[in-house]
Structures are given as C-alpha cells and as structure tokens.
Amino acid sequence: MGMSVTISAAAAEDAEQIFKLQYLAFQREAELYGNYLIQPLTQSLDSLKGELAADTVLVARLGDEVVGSVRGSVDEDGTGKITKLCVHPRLQGHGLGARLLRAVEEALAGGGGTVRFRLHTGHRSESNLRLYRKAGYTRVGGRTASDGVQLVILEKEAKDAADFAVSA
C-alpha cells in the first residue's frame, strides 16, 4: 500500500529540505527561460529561513520527505501574496500543486482580512498558467523581474477561493 501525501505547516527544521526541493523544482523554469539566475535558484538558505519565520509556509510530505512547498503572506491592503509554489518533478502533474494552492489560500484567508490572492509566474510557464487559470485566477498585469524574466501577475478575489473550494 502506498503512502499518501499530507500537507501541513512547515517547521524550522524543514528549511533544508524546502531549499533543496526549491532548487530542484525550479530547474525546469530556469531551462525554459535560459536563465539560471532566477530568484528561487539564487535564494540563500538564510533568506529562506527568514521567510519560514515570517510567512505562512506549507509543505507536502510523502513520508518524511518534503515533496512540495508554497509560501504566502497577507499585506496591509488584504492581498494574500502566494509565492514559490513548487512540487518535486517526479510528482508534478498529479494535482499536488492544486492541493498546495488551495491549502495556502485557506490558510491566508483564515484570518478574515484577506480580500484577494495574487501570484505571478513567467510568461512562458504554460503549465503554471493553466493551473492558476483552473483555480480561478485571471491576469491583472505583468512586469519584468530583476532577473529579466517577464512575469504574468494573476489575481482572484478571496470569496472566489471559497466558491472554488466548495465546487472542487
């Protein structure tokens, strides 16, 4: 009988596994853009530990192994910012990214002050864009990241997250 993947809040001791997973999972993005200086690949372990302490960080576990992760925070205007959603390459395409996305939306909305969710991905990242559109996100803009990648900015209203969770 196979193990199931569980999603929970990350602990400080998960930092190294998240760091390694992030580096592995974002290789395909770097290859897609021909740019290995994208922020998820250049982030330091200390910086990641700071995010673990300050933000909502969730992990997906298969046994003791971290196989997925996502981060989020809510700013003063009620925007839940979702970042660095990543899934181990061997588990991509099986719905784990969608589960992590729903879980972080629920966690960020739990405080009651979240009015919208915002995230971004590279303009060539079709699988990411498909995932986000399917989850109810729409394009609201774009910008060029400091590493030169053209980003697509997507949002959805927090109430849409509740509707999506009920209908999913």
Protein language model regions, located:
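Conserved beta-strand-loop-alpha-helix junction that forms the acyl-donor binding cleft
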Residues: 89, 118-129, 145-150
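Conserved GNAT acetyl-CoA-binding A-motif
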Residues: 108-121
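Conserved acetyl-CoA-binding loop-helix of GNAT-fold acetyltransferases
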Residues: 87, 93-106, 130, 134
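Conserved GNAT-fold acetyl-CoA-binding loop/helix
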Residues: 19-48
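Conserved beta-strand in the GNAT
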Residues: 59, 65-73, 81, 86
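A short helix-loop-beta-strand connector motif used in the catalytic cores of GNAT acetyltransferases and
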Residues: 47-59
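A short beta-loop-alpha structural element at the N-terminal edge
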Residues: 6-20
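Conserved active-site alpha-helix within GNAT-family acetyltransferase domains
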Residues: 98, 113, 123-141
